[in-house]
Amino acid sequence: AMLAFAVLLMPRGDKRRRARALGAAACVLLGVGAYLGAYADEAVYGRTANDALINIWSDNEVYLSRGFALSFLHSVPELFPEKPEGYDARAAQALLESFPDEDIPEGEKVAVMGVMLEAFCDLTDFDALAGFDTVQEVYAPWHALEEQSLSGRLLTNIFAGGTVDTEWGFLTGASEHDEYCGATGSYVRYFTAQGYAAHYAHPGYSWFYDRERVNDYLGFDRSVFTENGFGELVDPYVAMWHSDQQLADYLLADLDAADGSPLFSFAVSYQNHGPYAETESTVPYVSPEASGWSQESCNMLNNYLFGVNETVREYVRLTQELDARDTPVVLVLFGDHKPWMGNGGSVYEEMGIDFDTSTLAGFRNYYATPYLIWANRAAKEVLGADFTGDGGDFSPCFLMTRLFDACGWAGPGYMQLSRAMRDISPLLHTNGLFLHDGVLTSVLSDTDRSFYRSWLAVQYYREHVAAYS
C-alpha cells in the first residue's frame, strides 16, 4: 500500500498535484496509524522477541533482533523524556547556579574509592535468620567493620534487579533518571574538575546496561570491563560466584599506580549475582531440620551465604590493605538491592518476612541495603575526622553527599542543594514515597512539595539541558 501511494507522489506534471497531495496525506495517515497501532503496541513488540537466538541481557542484541524499524519506532518516546510538572529551564538553571561549587581544599584531596556490592544485604536484619549462629558468623566481620565506620541503610528504589538505579543514583546524586543519551551532570565530573582521575571497574561485560557508553556520559576517564582487562583475571561466568578477590586486588593496584595523585575509583562487583541454585548447596548454614523451611529454600540461602561469606572477608581484607598504606583513602561500600530468592520472593515468603511496603518496617525489609563509609588512618589524619557512628538511612542519591559530609567538604552546588532536599526527606522513592519526621508518607506540605518540584526540575535540567565538555 505504501508503494502504491508512493507512485502517486512521483512528479508527473501540474495535473497530478492533487493526486500527489492526496497520496502524501494518505501516507501520513497510514504511517501515523501504523505507529499508533502495531509499532507502539507493547503486545506486538513482545511477540517479536527472539530470545532463543540472542543474549537477552544485551540491549544491542535485543534491538537488532527485532528489526531496526520496529525497534527504532518503539524507542521514539525515549527521545522525548517527560518534563517535571511546572518545569521552567531558566528557573532551574537559576536555582542550581545559586549554589556555587566549592573546591576540595588542596591539602585534603584524599583518594575516594567506592564499591557497589552485587545483591548485598545483611540477612541478620531478619529475625528469621538472626537466630542462626552460622549466619551471624558470616556477617560478624562486616558488623565489626561497621563499628569502625559511618554506617546505615540505603533505602533503594529496586528489589532483586535494576542495579544501575542505585549505581547511577550514587554517581549523579539524582533521585530518578531517564535514558542517558548524552553527557550529563554527575559527581564524577566534579571530581575530574578538581584534578582527580576517575576510574571505573566491573568484572562483567561493558554492554550490560550499556555501561561503557553511559560511563562516558558520566565523565569517567577510564572504564575496565571483561573485554578490556578483567577477562584476563577471571572468566566472566565464574565472576558471578568468585571475583571479589580479583576486584579488590585490582582496586589496590590501581590506587598504587596513581602514586599519590588524586583518584576517584568506583567499582561494581559481580559476585553473588542471582539466581542461586536450589538443587544443592555446599555449606549448610541453614537446614530444613533447624529452620522448618524447604530444602530448596535452604539451598538458595546457603548458596547466597557462601558467596557473601567470601565477599565480606575480601572487603575486610581490602580495608586492612588500605590501612597499611600511606596514601589517604576514604572507602564507601554499599549494596545495590536485596538478592533474588526464588520466583515471587518464594524464600522470603517461606521465612515469613514482612514485605508490606505501605509500612516502614515492610518497606525497609524490601528495599534497604547496608552501606558503610570507612577511612584509613592516613585519611583520618588529613581530614581530622574519625568516620565512625550512625550515618543515617537515606536514598542512594544522598550517599555521596553523606561521604562529603564526613570529609568536611561542601562539594558542588548541586550537592549543596541536595542537602536542603535531604533535610525535607532523606527518602525520595520512585513510588512517590517520602520519609518525614520518621514517618513513611506520600504527602508533603505545600512548601516542601514546591521545593521537591524545584529539585526535580534541577535534576531534569542537569541531565538534559546543561552543557558539559
Question: What does each of the following model-derived ranges do?
Answer:
Residues 93-107, 114-117, 122-469:
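Solvent-exposed soluble domains appended to multi-pass membrane proteins
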Residues 1-109, 133-150, 181-185, 309, ...:
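N-terminal secretory/membrane-targeting segments
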